[in-house]
Amino acid sequence: MTNIRRTERVLLGAVFAMEAGGSVIFALMGNLQDEFQFSDAGLGFIAAAGFMASFVMQILIAPYADRGHAKRLLIIGTTLAVVGNALFASGSSLIIFVLARLISGAASGLFLPPARALMASLDEEGVSERLGAMGGAALAGFVTGPVIGGFLVGPLGLRWPFVIFSIAALISLFIVSTQHLPTLPYSKDRQRLAFGLLKQRSVLVPILMLSSIALPVGMYDALWDRFLTDIGASDIVVGLSLAAYALPFVVLSRFGGRLADRRGKVKVSFISMLFVAPLTALYGWFTVPLIPILLGMIESCAQAAGAPAGQGLLAEGAPEGRASAAQGLAGACNQLLAAVVAILATWGYGQVSAPTLFTIAGACVLLMGSVAQVLARKLPQGRPA
């Protein structure tokens, strides 16, 4: 038990550091643009580079963790996190910043799937609880990175936040590389592309459920700032609203996972979706910023149960020797869906009213989640749910 707890703490700390170091750029992109005078399109190139690299790594490279290379991928991912932030700290051109973001995105894509698979494999009991804790640590890091970066850039200058997070990643690298980690169940079969796992219902169901509750995130990434500003929120209120949305998930995700382990992962993930869908539909109907913010906090509570439930279901449903591949596939699908939704939402916001747009999004959540629930009824008997 002691070794399990120690490994859990190492993985949680490393995930927090990885996500914090990867997200600090979001608070500093405007500063980089002002300092080095590149176009608005350059901001898009930097953001897109991270997404593309993470997506490719999760699909093509993360499955190698299932061949006995899980720790090696964690080490390589953490090393890339050091390099990515070091490049941001030393760079002075758009090309270097795009390369730095490409490396940082690859770091996350290499690290997270094997980390989730290892966390799930530590014990047959409490799978969703541990994955919930990891999700909470990841989101806490993602939110903390920009806050620390924004706080440090004034007194220390633009380069030092990246230097500090590069040092933090270096410390994480030392801890991960010296820690004894378990090995994932080994597969000697020839590995095919992870997309082939979608043919298996035990993988498709949790990915559909996870994608359904993750769908609104793509809208929030693209529209939350603009929507709240349009209904009268100040920049400070918008910033606080993001922290308010994240806080319930960070605090409750471990408990949500524990609930899923006890009450059933399919049941908890479906009930969570039934909360997320109407809450998503309601956002656009209010013109007082406080109400959407409060709805977001309620939705975050539902996400804190649904996400660990879906991830735990995926961990248990992945074929023997394909645990990391399945986790990478789920992460890649969520990223792809979020990108598509962000593009469509940005376009749709200028074409239809906010109530209509958010209602459509809520209906899509309900549709995807309902399809997953129907398919879940046909899962093989005896599979943990």
Regions found by a protein language model. Give the residues of each.
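Juxtamembrane intracellular "pre-TM" segments in multi-pass secondary transporters
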Residues: 1-5, 180-207
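Helix-loop boundary and gating motifs at the non-cytosolic
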Residues: 5-51, 205, 214-231, 238
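Residue-level signature of mid-helix packing/kink "hotspots" within the transmembrane helices
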Residues: 51-59, 142-143, 246-254, 338-339
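Conserved MFS/SLC helix-loop-helix module at the cytosolic interface between two early adjacent transmembrane helices
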Residues: 56-92, 260-263
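Structural signature of the two symmetry-related core transmembrane helices
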Residues: 72-86, 166, 267-281
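Paired small-residue
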Residues: 84, 95-103, 290-298
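Cytoplasmic helix-loop-helix junction between adjacent transmembrane helices
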Residues: 100-138
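A late C-terminal transmembrane helix in Major Facilitator Superfamily
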Residues: 322-350
